[in-house]
C-alpha cells in the first residue's frame, strides 16, 4: 500500500481548499440512522470481520483517495502511480456534503483505523458506516479534524447564505400593501380581511376629510354596497403549527367586537412593518406601497422595489393563518407572530391587494403548496431521536454497559440480555453464532452484537415512538370519543412488557403515573361540560405533544385578550373568577407552579381592584396571566427543560426558591440576622420591586465586612447641568458625524454602482480631444434650446462616445431630435409622473418577473436575484406597461431598458425608453399583432437580395428566413446576443440617426461574414453560426462594422420596400380563391390592418404637415430677414450717395484755392 499523501489544491470555481488523503477502504455497512456512538465500535468490528472474509475469497485491497472540502466529501479509487486518472473507469465510491457526516470514531485499540457514519436517506432512516485504514496512524487525527472542520464551515455557510432568492424554489407576485392590524389570536374568522379593508377605508376617509389627498388605489366598496353573494374563499392555517381555538362569539361573526382587534396600525407602518433590527424601513404609506411578495422554500419575503430592500421577512413557522377576502376577492392577508418590546410577542395581520381575483387564487395555492412542502421537508430533516420504548434504545444501553469490559464480562452481560428476548429469538441467535464457529470470546461477542443489531433494527422499523403514539391517540380521541385506537393498546402492552424487565418498584410507579395522567385527561373532558369558555382551549391542548406544554397552555380567554387589549387585569379576573370551580385540581395547581418557574412574580406588586372571591386566588390568577401572556411558543421547550431540571416546587409561586436543608443550614450560618423562611424574606423586600434570583450558595452580606459602604456624594445642580450640556454636545457631534459618514458612504456607493454598471469593454476608445468636444457641447448653457450642427455631432459620434458621459450624451441627442422635429406626435403618451406609475399594480407582472433573470444574467449589476439592478429594471418595465396599455410588455423590452439603465438613473432611463418607443417609433414593432416586425423582416430580405444576392440565394436554398435569426436583433437591438460595448455603439447611432440603424448593422454583419456563412451547407449549422459565432466579434471587426454603418444610407430603399410589401399583400388577397367565410375573415383582417396603416399614414401625414409648417415658418423668417436686408441695403446706398456728394464737394472746395494761388504775393527775405 502506498504511503498516505497529503496534498492541498485549490479549485478553479471556488476559493475553497480541498485536501486529499490516500487511504485504504476496509469496507462499509448500511445501518439505522439511530445508531449511537456506543454501538459504533461494534459496527466497525463487524465491517472488519466482513472485510477479512471477503479478502480470503478475493484478496484485493481498495486504495482510495478521500477528498475533503467544505463543498463536499468525495471518496474515489486511487489509480496508482503507473495508471492515469480516468473518470470513465474510476467512478467515485461515494460523494456527500460534509455536514452529512454526523459521527466519526477513532479506534483506540488499533489507531490506524477510523470510521465515519454518513446519512444516506433521511426518509427511510438509513445511514452507511465507512471504515478506513491509514498507513500512517499519526495522520488519522488530522483526517478526522479536517472532516469536522469542513462540516463546520459548510454549516456556517448554510446559515449565512440561505437560498433566499433562488429562481428554482421561489415565486414572486406584485402586491399592494394596504395595512396591518394587531389581533389577539393566531387565527381569525373568515370575514377578517373584509373587516380590515373597511377599517382601512374608514381611516383613509377620515384622513382625507382632514387633509385632502387622492384616494388610495386599494379603496374598495364596503360591505353595505355589495351583498355577500360569494362563499368563503380559500383560507387555511399552516399545518404543524399549534393553534388555539377562537371564542364562540368570534366564530359566530363577532369580529366587530372590541376584543379581537387590539389596535389598528396603518399610520405607523414605516415603524412596524419590518421584523428585525437589520432591515431598512420601507417607504411611507402615502408613498409607493407596491411590494414584491416572494414565496421561498421556508419563508415569505416582502421586497420594496422603491427602496431595493427587504421590507418584511417571515418564516413559515411564524405564519399561522392565511385568508382571501369574501367581498373583496382581490385582497388577501396573513397573520404572523411578531416580538414586542417587552420580550413577549403579539399577532399581526398584514393585508394586501392584487390586480385581480385570479392572482389572489394563485398566491393562496402557492402558499398552500409551499407550506405543505416545507412541512414534509422539515419532518424529513428532523433529527431522529430514541424514546424509552425504542428497540435500539435497549441496544444502546447494552453497549453502554459493556463498554470498557473485558471479553468474559462482556459475554456474561450479553447472556443476561439474551434472557430478555423470546425463546425463538434466543434460539435463532444461538444457531447463527454456532454456525460461524467463533475462535474466541471476543469474536463470539461481536457476532452476538451483530445479530442483536439486525434484530433490533427490524423491530425499529415497526416501532411507534411515544410522542407519535400520543398524537395518534389524541387525534383518534377527538373523532371517536373516549375509545383508544388499537395502536395505542399495542403500544401500552409493549411499554408494560419493557417496564416489567425492571424492578417491581419502578414498574408500579410508572403504572401509577400513567393512571394519574389518564385521570387528568378524564378531568379535562369533564371540565369541557362544566366550563364552556374553556372548551375550545382544553380540546386543543389535548393535541399538544408534550406533557409540560399540555399543562402550560390551557388558560382562560382573558389572558389572550391581554395580548393586545387595554382592559384592566383586575376586571378580567373579576369577570372570569366565578366561572371557575372553587377547588383547584392538582393539574391546575401544577400548571400554575410550572409557569412561575420561568417568570418571577414580584413584578405584580401593585394591588389590583378588590375581587369578589378570595384575594389569594385572584392574585394567583393574575400572576398566571402575566406569565402566559409573555411566553412565546419557542420558550416552551426551554420551560420544559427547566421544569424537568428543577422538579416540582412548593404550593405558592414564591416558594419556588426554597432551598435544601443543607443550603438552609448554610444560609443560617452565613446570614444569622435573617430568618430561614423564604416567605418572610420576600416580605421584607417586597417594597424593592423585582429582585434578581440569588444563588443558593452565595452568602448574603448586607453591609460588607467593614461596615456600611460610603454614601455617594450628591452632585449640585450646576454639576448636573454641565453634565447634561456635555452629553447633549456629544450627542449632537455624534449625529453630525453619522450624517457625514452617511453622505460619504452614499457617494462611495454611487461611485461603486456606476463603476459596476459600466463594467464592459469599450469598442471605440474615445480620445481626449473628442472627450473635450463632448464636454464642451454638454456644458453649453441652455443647450436644450440650442440647435447644434448635425455634421459636427455626426463627426463626434463617429469618433467615439466616452463611456462615463454616454448617458448624458444620449439625453443631449434626444434634445436635439426634439429641436429638429418640433411637432407634437399623435400617439404621445399621457404625461403621468414616474412615481405615480410605480404606485399602481400591473397585470404584466408575471412576464416581467420571468424576464428579469434572463436579462444580462452575466452582468454583475443584474446578476443578483432581485437585487438593485433587477428591481430598478422591474420598475421601468412596470411603469411603461402601465403607461402604454396597447403594448404593455413585450419580450425584448427588458434588454432595451437594461442598456439604458446601465448608463443613467432609473427615472432618466424611463424617459429615454419613452423617447425611443414614441418619438423614434420603436413601439410599432412591439404591438401584439407584430405586423411591423413582419414588414421589417421583408425589408431585410430585400436588402440582402439587392446588396448580397449570393448570400440571399444561399439562405433561400436552405429555407432560412430572417425571422429565424434576425427577430432578436430588432426586438432587443442586438443586446441579447452581442457584447455590451458593441450594443452601446449601436445605441449611439440609433439616438443620432433613428431606427434604420438596425437594418444597417444587420446588413453590415451579414455582408462581412458572407464567406463564412456560404461555407456551411445545412440549416442547423448556418443558423448556429449566425446566432452563436457571429456575435463573438473581435474589436477590429466591430469597429469596422460601425464605420460601415456611418457610410450607409438606405432610407429611400426602406420606404420603397414597405410600400412594396403592402402592394404584394393586397395582390395576394385578391388572387387567392377562397370561400365566402375565408374571404370575409381575410377582408376583416385586411380592413383592420388597413385601418392601422391608415393611422400610421395619418401620423406620417401629421409629421409631414409639421415639417411643412416648420419649413413655412422658416421661409417666413427668411423673407422677413430678406426685407430687412433690402432696407438695410437701400439705407447703405443712400448713405453711399450722400458720401459721394460730400466727397465731390470737398474736391470742388479743394480745387478753388489752387486757382487763386498766382495772385498771392510772396514775402521778401530778411537780411542778417
Swiss-Prot record:
An MF annotation (GO) of this entry: GTPase activator activity
Post-translational modification: Insulin-stimulated phosphorylation by AKT family kinases stimulates SLC2A4/GLUT4 translocation.
Residue ranges, annotated region (Disordered): 203-238, 532-551, 564-587, 628-658, 678-717, 1145-1168
InterPro entries in the record: DUF3350, PH-like_dom_sf, PTB/PI_dom, Rab-GAP-TBC_dom, Rab-GAP_TBC_sf, Rab_GAP_TBC_domain
Ranges of biased composition (kind: Basic and acidic residues): 632-645, 1145-1159
GO CC, alphabetical: Golgi apparatus; nucleus
Residues annotated as domain PID: 246-404
Keyword Phosphoprotein among UniProt keywords: yes
Pfam family membership, one: DUF3350
Keywords: GTPase activation, Nucleus, Phosphoprotein
Positions carrying Phosphotyrosine: 952
Gene3D superfamilies xrefs: 1.10.10.2750, Pleckstrin-homology domain (PH domain)/Phosphotyrosine-binding domain (PTB), putative rabgap domain of human tbc1 domain family member 14 like domains, Ypt/Rab-GAP domain of gyp1p, domain 3
Location(s) in or outside the cell: Nucleus
Modified residues (Phosphothreonine): 505, 596, 1131
Reported impact of residue 930 to A: Substantially reduced RabGAP GTPase hydrolysis activity
Quaternary data: Interacts with APPL2 (via BAR domain); interaction is dependent of TBC1D1 phosphorylation at Ser-235; interaction diminishes the phosphorylation of TBC1D1 at Thr-596, resulting in inhibition of SLC2A4/GLUT4 translocation and glucose uptake.
Functional summary from the UniProt entry: May act as a GTPase-activating protein for Rab family protein(s). May play a role in the cell cycle and differentiation of various tissues. Involved in the trafficking and translocation of GLUT4-containing vesicles and insulin-stimulated glucose uptake into cells.
Protein name: TBC1 domain family member 1
Species of the source: Homo sapiens
Amino acid at each position: 500500500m502506498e504511503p498516505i499523501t497529503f496534498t492541498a489544491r485549490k479549485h478553479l470555481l471556488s476559493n475553497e481548499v480541498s485536501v486529499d488523503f490516500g487511504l485504504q477502504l476496509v469496507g462499509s455497512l448500511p445501518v439505522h440512522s439511530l445508531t449511537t456512538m456506543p454501538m459504533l465500535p461494534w459496527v466497525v468490528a463487524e465491517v472488519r470481520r466482513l472485510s477479512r472474509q471477503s479478502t480470503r475469497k478475493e484478496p484485493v485491497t481498495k486504495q482510495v483517495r478521500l477528498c475533503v472540502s467544505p463543498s463536499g466529501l468525495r471518496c474515489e479509487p486511487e489509480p496508482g502511480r503507473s495508471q492515469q486518472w480516468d473518470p470513465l473507469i474510476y467512478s467515485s465510491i461515494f460523494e456527500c456534503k460534509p455536514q452529512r457526516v454526523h459521527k466519526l470514531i477513532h479506534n483506540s485499540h488499533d489507531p490506524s483505523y477510523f470510521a465515519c457514519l454518513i446519512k444516506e436517506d433521511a426518509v427511510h432512516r438509513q445511514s452507511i458506516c465507512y471504515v478506513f485504514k491509514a498507513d500512517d496512524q499519526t495522520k488519522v487525527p488530522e483526517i478526522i479534524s479536517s472532516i469536522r472542520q469542513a462540516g463546520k464551515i459548510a454549516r456556517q455557510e448554510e446559515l449565512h447564505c440561505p437560498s433566499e432568492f433562488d429562481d428554482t424554489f421561489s415565486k414572486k407576485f406584485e402586491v399592494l400593501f394596504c395595512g396591518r392590524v394587531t389581533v389577539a389570536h393566531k387565527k381569525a374568522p373568515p370575514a377578517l380581511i373584509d373587516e380590515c379593508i373597511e377599517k382601512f377605508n374608514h381611516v383613509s376617509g377620515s384622513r382625507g376629510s382632514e387633509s385632502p389627498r387622492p384616494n388610495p388605489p386599494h379603496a374598495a366598496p364596503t360591505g353595505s354596497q355589495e351583498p355577500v353573494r360569494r362563499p368563503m374563499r380559500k383560507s387555511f392555517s399552516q399545518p404543524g403549527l399549534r393553534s388555539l381555538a377562537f371564542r364562540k362569539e368570534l366564530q359566530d361573526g363577532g369580529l366587530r367586537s372590541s376584543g379581537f382587534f387590539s389596535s389598528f396600525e396603518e399610520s405607523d407602518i414605516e415603524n412596524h412593518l419590518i421584523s428585525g433590527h437589520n432591515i431598512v424601513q420601507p417607504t411611507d404609506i402615502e408613498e409607493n406601497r407596491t411590494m414584491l411578495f416572494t414565496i421561498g422554500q421556508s419563508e415569505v419575503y416582502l421586497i420594496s422595489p422603491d427602496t431595493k430592500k427587504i421590507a418584511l421577512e417571515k418564516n413559515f413557522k411564524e405564519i399561522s393563518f392565511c385568508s382571501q377576502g369574501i367581498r373583496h376577492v382581490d385582497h388577501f392577508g396573513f397573520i404572523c407572530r411578531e416580538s414586542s418590546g417587552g420580550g413577549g410577542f403579539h399577532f399581526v395581520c398584514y393585508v394586501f391587494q392584487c390586480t385581480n381575483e385570479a392572482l389572489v387564487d394563485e398566491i393562496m395555492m402557492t402558499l398552500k403548496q409551499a407550506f405543505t412542502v416545507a412541512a414534509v421537508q422539515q419532518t424529513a430533516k428532523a433529527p431522529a431521536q430514541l424514546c424509552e420504548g425504542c428497540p435500539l434504545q435497549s441496544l444502546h444501553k447494552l453497549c453502554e454497559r459493556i463498554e470498557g469490559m473485558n471479553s468474559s464480562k462482556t459475554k456474561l452481560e450479553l447472556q443476561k440480555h439474551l434472557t430478555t428476548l423470546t425463546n425463538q429469538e434466543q434460539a435463532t441467535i444461538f444457531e447463527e453464532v454456532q454456525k460461524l464457529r467463533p475462535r474466541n470470546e471476543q469474536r463470539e461477542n461481536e457476532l452476538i452484537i451483530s445479530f442483536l443489531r439486525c434484530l433490533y433494527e427490524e423491530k425499529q422499523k415497526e416501532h411507534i415512538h411515544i410522542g407519535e403514539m400520543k398524537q395518534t391517540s389524541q387525534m383518534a380521541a377527538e373523532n371517536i370519543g373516549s375509545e383508544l385506537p388499537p395502536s395505542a393498546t399495542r403500544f401500552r402492552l409493549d411499554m408494560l412488557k419493557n417496564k416489567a424487565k425492571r424492578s417491581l418498584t419502578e414498574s408500579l410507579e410508572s403504572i401509577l403515573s400513567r393512571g394519574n395522567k389518564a385521570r387528568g385527561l378524564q378531568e379535562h373532558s369533564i371540565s369541557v361540560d362544566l366550563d364552556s369558555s374553556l372548551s375550545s382551549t382544553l380540546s386543543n391542548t389535548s393535541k399538544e405533544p408534550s406533557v409540560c406544554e399540555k399543562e402550560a397552555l390551557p388558560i382562560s380567554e382573558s389572558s389572550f385578550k391581554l395580548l393586545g387589549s387595554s382592559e384592566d387585569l383586575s376586571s378580567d379576573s373579576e369577570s372570569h373568577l366565578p366561572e371557575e370551580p372553587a377547588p383547584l385540581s392538582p393539574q391546575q395547581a401544577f400548571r400554575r407552579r410550572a409557569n412561575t418557574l420561568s417568570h418571577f412574580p414580584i413584578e405584580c406588586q401593585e394591588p389590583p381592584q378588590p375581587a369578589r372571591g378570595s384575594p389569594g386566588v385572584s392574585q394567583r390568577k393574575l400572576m398566571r396571566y402575566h406569565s402566559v401572556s409573555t411566553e412565546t411558543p419557542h420558550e416552551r421547550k426551554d420551560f420544559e427543560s427547566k421544569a424537568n431540571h428543577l422538579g416540582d416546587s412548593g404550593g405558592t409561586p414564591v416558594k419556588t426558591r426554597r432551598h435544601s436543608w443543607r443550603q438552609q443550614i448554610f444560609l443560617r450560618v452565613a446570614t444569622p440576622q435573617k430568618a430561614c423562611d423564604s416567605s418572610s424574606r420576600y416580605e421584607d423586600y417586597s417594597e424593592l420591586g423585582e429582585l434578581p434570583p440569588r444563588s443558593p450558595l452565595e452568602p448574603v452580606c448586607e453591609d460588607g465586612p467593614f461596615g456600611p459602604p460610603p454614601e455617594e456624594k450628591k452632585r449640585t445642580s450646576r454639576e448636573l447641568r454641565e453634565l447634561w450640556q456635555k452629553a447633549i454636545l456629544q450627542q449632537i457631534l455624534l449625529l453630525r458625524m453619522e450624517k457625514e459618514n452617511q453622505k460619504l458612504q452614499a457617494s462611495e456607493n454611487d461611485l461603486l454602482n456606476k463603476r459596476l454598471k459600466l463594467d464592459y469593454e469599450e469598442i471605440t476608445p474615445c480620445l481626449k480631444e473628442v472627450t473635450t468636444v463632448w464636454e464642451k457641447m454638454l456644458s453649453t448653457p441652455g443647450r436644450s434650446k440650442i440647435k447644434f450642427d448635425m455634421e459636427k455631432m455626426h463627426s463626434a459620434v463617429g469618433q467615439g462616445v466616452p463611456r462615463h458621459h454616454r448617458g448624458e450624451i444620449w439625453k443631449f441627442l434626444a434634445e436635439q431630435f426634439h429641436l429638429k422635429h418640433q411637432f407634437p406626435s399623435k400617439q404621445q403618451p399621457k404625461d403621468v409622473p414616474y412615481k405615480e406609475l410605480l404606485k399602481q399594480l400591473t397585470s404584466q407582472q408575471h412576464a416581467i418577473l420571468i424576464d428579469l433573470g434572463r436579462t444580462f444574467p452575466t452582468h454583475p449589476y443584474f446578476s443578483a436575484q432581485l437585487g438593485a439592478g433587477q428591481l430598478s429594471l422591474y420598475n421601468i418595465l412596470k411603469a411603461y406597461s402601465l403607461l402604454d396599455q396597447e403594448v404593455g410588455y413585450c419580450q425584448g423590452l427588458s434588454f432595451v431598458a437594461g442598456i439604458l439603465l446601465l448608463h443613467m438613473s432609473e427615472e432618466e432611463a424611463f424617459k429615454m425608453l419613452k423617447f425611443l418607443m414614441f418619438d423614434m417609433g420603436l413601439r410599432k414593432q412591439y404591438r401584439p399583432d407584430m405586423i411591423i416586425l413582419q414588414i421589417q423582416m421583408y425589408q431585410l430580405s430585400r436588402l440582402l437580395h439587392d446588396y448580397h444576392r449570393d448570400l440571399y440565394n444561399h439562405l433561400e436554398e436552405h429555407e432560412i428566413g430572417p425571422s429565424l435569426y434576425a427577430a432578436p436583433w430588432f426586438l432587443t437591438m442586438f443586446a441579447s446576443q452581442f457584447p455590451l460595448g458593441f450594443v452601446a455603439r449601436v445605441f449611439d447611432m440609433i439616438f443620432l440617426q433613428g431606427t434604420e440603424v438596425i437594418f444597417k448593422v444587420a446588413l453590415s454583419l451579414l455582408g462581412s461574414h458572407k464567406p463564412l456563412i456560404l461555407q456551411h451547407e445545412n440549416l442547423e449549422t448556418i443558423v448556429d453560426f449566425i446566432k452563436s459565432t457571429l456575435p463573438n466579434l473581435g474589436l477590429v471587426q466591430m469597429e469596422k462594422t460601425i464605420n460601415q454603418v456611418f457610410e450607409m444610407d438606405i432610407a429611400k430603399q426602406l420606404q420603397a420596400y414597405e410600400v412594396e410589401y403592402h402592394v404584394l399583400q393586397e395582390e395576394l388577397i385578391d388572387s387567392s380563391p377562397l370561400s365566402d367565410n375565408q374571404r370575409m375573415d381575410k377582408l376583416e383582417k385586411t380592413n383592420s390592418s388597413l385601418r392601422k396603416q391608415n393611422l400610421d399614414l395619418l401620423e406620417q401625414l401629421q409629421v409631414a404637415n409639421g415639417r411643412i409648417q416648420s419649413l413655412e415658418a422658416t421661409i417666413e423668417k427668411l423673407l422677413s430677414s430678406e426685407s430687412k436686408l433690402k432696407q438695410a441695403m437701400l439705407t447703405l446706398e443712400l448713405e453711399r450717395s450722400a458720401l459721394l456728394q460730400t466727397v465731390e464737394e470737398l474736391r470742388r472746395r479743394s480745387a478753388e484755392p489752387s486757382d487763386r494761388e498766382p495772385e498771392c504775393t510772396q514775402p521778401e527775405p530778411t537780411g542778417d
